[in-house]
Amino acid sequence: RFIQGRGNYVDDIKLPGMLSGDFVRSPYAHARIKAIDASAALELPGVIAVLTAADLKPLNLHYMPTLAGDVQAVLADEKVLFQNQEVAFVIAEDRYIAADAVELVEVDYEELPPIVDAFKSMDDDAICLREDIKDKLEGAHSPRKHVNHIFNWEVGEKAATDAVFAQAEVTVKELISYQRVHPAPLETCACLAAMDKVKGEITIYGTFQAPHVVRTVVSLLSGIPEAKVHVIAPDIGGGFGNKVGVYPGYVCAIVASIVLGVPVKWVEDRIENLTATAFARDYHMTAELAATKEGRITGLRAHVLADHGAFDACADPTKFPAGFFHICTGSYDIPTAHVAVDGVYTNKAPGGVAYRCSFRVTEAVYMLERIVDVLAQKLNMDPAALRMKNFIQPEQFPYTSALGWEYDSGNYPAALKQGLQAVGYDALRREQAEKRARGELMGIGLATFTEIVGAGPSRNCDILGVAMFDSCEIRIHPTGSAIARLGTKSQGQAHETTYAQILATEVGIPSEDIQIEEGDTRT
């Protein structure tokens, strides 16, 4: 139906009396707000209201909870902390009037020096970015070392690992940075909120990858019981983790609908999506390996400086503020390991989204495979041979890593051997040697990737108390047809087709007789 143009997205939904909202955004990465003058905008025909943090404060709605246990300004409160941060919300009869009115709102800023380098965020003379929590000594996950510090998280045996490094025959160390990236889904973020004041219920349509989490956040923020918050995610044009969290646009549309009693829609444009919604990666990883002269890895040590931007809005499990980064021993049998992660604030848009649901696994693998290559270079050893020497062997499964992961099965040597044969690895190395002898450059990349399937039991994996698992309810009608209601939400992959095919195979009902419902907190 998507290729036939029959998708139903948030912006396709029109409700009677619906208003539209648009944001006044900061041109500065760091600045104090001295004054906001919305008088000219309010005089424009069709403009209903202009909301600022001053309007939200009496309602205790000027800050919203993030999925990481932090709070984020819905509208900049006295200070802006990243370029294009939301400063005011204009509500008008349609989006075009709202966009025109945005240009009429005048904001007087006092520009402040920004911190955009994570390595400088905790300097002794670094300016305090989050003045709203400057006196808060205890973070959501650990004590705070500095006003711009978010958390410290460690896993593994530090003393044992340090002892291995002290006695190691060979060590290597490298700073490996994974730059900030943006998921950039085809459809930008959007929300349509409709408050029913008679029933005391609110219905919210939005680009939500995790509708149930959104319901929880809306309930926490508004005080409306979860049972009266109905969240619906229609078709979504791509997510990649960008649509897991809650954004100020959602909250402003919801608040406006509650106050005005009419439906209010917000749809961001491409520039807003690329500059103000959640980014990913931005990890600066100092990795070390200890090994024997023959290439047997004996220890891994890593420190990560995680740039989370102005607000910690990650969607990582509560117990794992660095996500699943501690999978960083990968496919290798490394006896000892220790990892420490420090999250910091900078004057950037919130970061740390689980881009493509990696939960930091991508960063972990990148760091590990790079440092293994560095070790291979130091030992003058073939990278494939070094990996073969250190793989977890088939007879070692089930295997528990030095950082606590339980591996159920695998045959990594056989997998790599098959891959090397498929690409003609030996021939490629000979070709590389010949070209280098002629002064030509030719590189051969090699990496292994151990992925986690399933987030884990809910006692270990939750976000804001919402367990990271999903369920499916299947009902068989007397006519022989079926309906399946799921907690998951596809983002353009047409999961409903796949789910129907799986059920058809298992139950023995034709897939065309199976109705799939997803993305609705009422089902």
What is the role of each PLM region?
Residues 86, 92-94, 258-309:
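Phosphate/diphosphate-binding loops
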Residues 10-19, 165, 184-189, 339-350, ...:
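Flexible hinge/switch segments at interdomain interfaces of large molecular machines
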